[in-house]
């Protein structure tokens, strides 16, 4: 009888040892494996196993071997025909032990599904099998398809050891000699087995896979505590066997169907599989085929069902966990009575039928899955696994229309990259995101052969905004606007009949009259010739859009009569790799755009978000271009960054495969100017005043490297909950209106924050930025014939916007002794001289000083406003961040307003922004609360044309407000931010004071004001690029001097409205803040 040297004297001795217990048998088999692993004892050990199998067969013990000796050796026959590879072998010799799932219908069906793939699927590929059990499928794959490597993975350490024994059993014949395949390799060259929790072994060892196959448990353990035990080699056989039957909760939405482990396997597979890799999974049909299929599709995989059959439910598997799920869930699992039943029964019925000794079955399918956008989906899941696991339950990458998937998945990948790689959103100029403008110019150059530069493209929130801003910039006496483009214009423009002004009047009057006109060019041109408007805004009819003749005719006529022309190409412009021909762009390809004309294009045609809009304007006249971009800064604040990212991603997809600069741009003909532009209408007087005198943002150029301490934006690291909310808003599909409705929780937020009760009759109005809402209030003030009263020391952007709109502004003096706060005495002295006052108050945090109004101070100001019947705008947009405020008890607006009597026209509105306290950078959300009676109905047309936050932003806002109410991670992030900003303020104050500035210490917000006392009256001389700049420093040039000398942007006295006082914001990125302090020190040294 065979023996193993140094281990067992005979087979009987080996069997006697194994018969003692399962642990004894496993110990004996592990010792045998050690002999198989050593080349010098391998042959002897393999011969011993051959003799062992023969003895068990000859003794008739093979059928009861598992009960008697706690192991079993059996042959598995797979091929019907003559096999290939291993000398026409048709069988596999396999060993099992009690703690391993026995090969049966479940795994055989899985192999049959794999078998339906073409032979090339595994050839020379790197493969992993999840839940390999005793390894027979891994070995079968290696034998039949000759892969490069198969990794058999199982969480059960005993299964891995038995798999190695089975590998040796089949890699060597009964004489202990290696069996070679057609490539002269053995199974040992192709297969390896490792203990691994799903794909952790491959992930930890940086193994990229081309194929993943898995046949893993899909029923929750009836005893959840059992699954929390540590998986060790010495664990009980019952526990180890349960790993083959049951799974634990995995934290996925699919847990409710018992599919959580499969879901985790798929997501881990996405991480390690190569882009064109394939995953094949056995799916029990108990949850229903739709649920099983959706598990894969919502993770961005296309699914092919290879094989489906029915199998009997394993008698040792307890389905009571599924019964419990059905109790609290309308979903019903699918079982069948026997193999021939064709009507499904629920888990509860199946459980009862099984208890009554009935046989129940369920469908079993084999799914082959492949990533539809592999690189992008991988990037999405790479982002999710880094602290954003909860979002994966909201992720939905299933699309019925491939074109929708082709658009949305790349954007989600891009957004994931932005959120993962960037700790914060960068500063974006009002002109628009530089990358986005580059992409638009490149698209025009590549697809339409129009040689535009980035400096010819300005970004607007929408087409309607671009049109209204253009009209406000010029304030024409008469404008003709194509009828389809007038819907968002102010109603009074469309009803005015003041068109009898003399044509010789070169100075625009305040009122704008808009005449609607048809789009057809011959009718439009006839109106232009008869009415002689100063501005024309029109599109091109579809039947005229292909050629440039209609556009050229419009150019010629408008030039002859001195009209400015804005052409809308939104309806013809296509984001496509084969865009339709557009006559306007054909003209631009051969001729520069005339100075009196500009092109407006609203991007409306995306396949995912039909209501997500952004627009761009093209002008090749620098003065007009600069002025148009300033209107965005003055009237809207900026264009929503996420919208620019979305359309930028679409442009990028259309350009990414193109070879840059492959085609030489054709030379354009010089513009044939037949008339002088002198007769053209110029900018309105208020626009000229603001553009020439107000302090606006510094233009960013290719060569400039500026530091911005002049921007009301937080550039600190974006907290994880904020990133999660932003991504989830785009990752989800079919978001309901209720999930986006901010109003209920905002009403509660306002009550909790400022003790301001907002009744249900109050109106909430939303916009992308608070500045846009402020401007609409200014227009209401103008329409009422009121005066806008603003304290000296108000936000310079708001003051400039009100001037641009030509409001009647009354400045309320403030004094240094009280930190330039507005006092009741000063307010009263102004209001007693003003008719129909509108009072603007920034609070509790005052921008720009950073001081706080106490509750008593606010009550006294509201009392004065009530006495004089002032409409009062309380702007909370810059409030939320507080420090050095231990003695500040907050506001109680309800109490302050209670009992106030006076002029009946007194009313209060609340202006605010949701994201100022939270560093969201790229997001903004403005709100305006109008209590009943604040505005007459006739004023409401002033609010037309507002750019409302997109549903994704609304969803994010609601999510963050809810998180704030829960006092969780988001609250901690906000508190940490306040501590950081308090430290920043201290450092900035010390630096400024050491350099000769007088600082008024802030108590909140992100800005502080200071007076350059040590520099006033001193000369400074700067030399750069061969030129010299010399000046005597004063309040009018201190900002320019700082910028020229150091590249640091600050706000000067003309912005703060306080003589000699400049503003510094300090919510910069860490490195930028340190460099900004260095600039302040450098400037001090230069002046000295």
UniProtKB/Swiss-Prot annotation:
Gene3D superfamilies in UniProt: Aspartate Aminotransferase, domain 1, Type I PLP-dependent aspartate aminotransferase-like (Major domain), Vaccinia Virus protein VP39
Pfam families (alphabetical): Aminotran_1_2, MTS
InterPro entries assigned to the protein according to its UniProt record, in alphabetical order: Aminotransferase_I/II_large (IPR004839), Met_S-MeTrfase (IPR025779), PyrdxlP-dep_Trfase (IPR015424), PyrdxlP-dep_Trfase_major (IPR015421), PyrdxlP-dep_Trfase_small (IPR015422), SAM-dependent_MTases_sf (IPR029063), Small_mtfrase_dom (IPR007848)
UniProt keyword Membrane, yes or no: no
Annotated EC: 2.1.1.12
Entry-linked SUPFAM superfamilies: PLP-dependent transferases (SSF53383), S-adenosyl-L-methionine-dependent methyltransferases (SSF53335)
Gene Ontology CC annotations of this record: cytoplasm
Enzyme superclass (EC): transferase
pH dependence comment: Optimum pH is 7.2.
Alphabetical UniProt keywords: Cytoplasm, Methyltransferase, S-adenosyl-L-methionine, Transferase
PROSITE patterns according to UniProt: SAM_MT12
Lineage top rank: taxon: Eukaryota
Main location: cytoplasm
GO biological process: biosynthetic process; methylation
Function noted in UniProt: Catalyzes the S-methylmethionine (SMM) biosynthesis from adenosyl-L-homocysteine (AdoMet) and methionine. SMM biosynthesis (by MMT1) and degradation (by HMT-1, HMT-2 and HMT-3) constitute the SMM cycle in plants, which is probably required to achieve short term control of AdoMet level. Also able to catalyze the selenium-methylmethionine (SeMM) from AdoMet and selenium-methionine (SeMet). May play a role in phoem sulfur transport; such function is however not essential.
Family per similarity comment: Belongs to the class I-like SAM-binding methyltransferase superfamily.
Complex and partners: Homotetramer.
Record-given protein name: Methionine S-methyltransferase
Organism: Wollastonia biflora
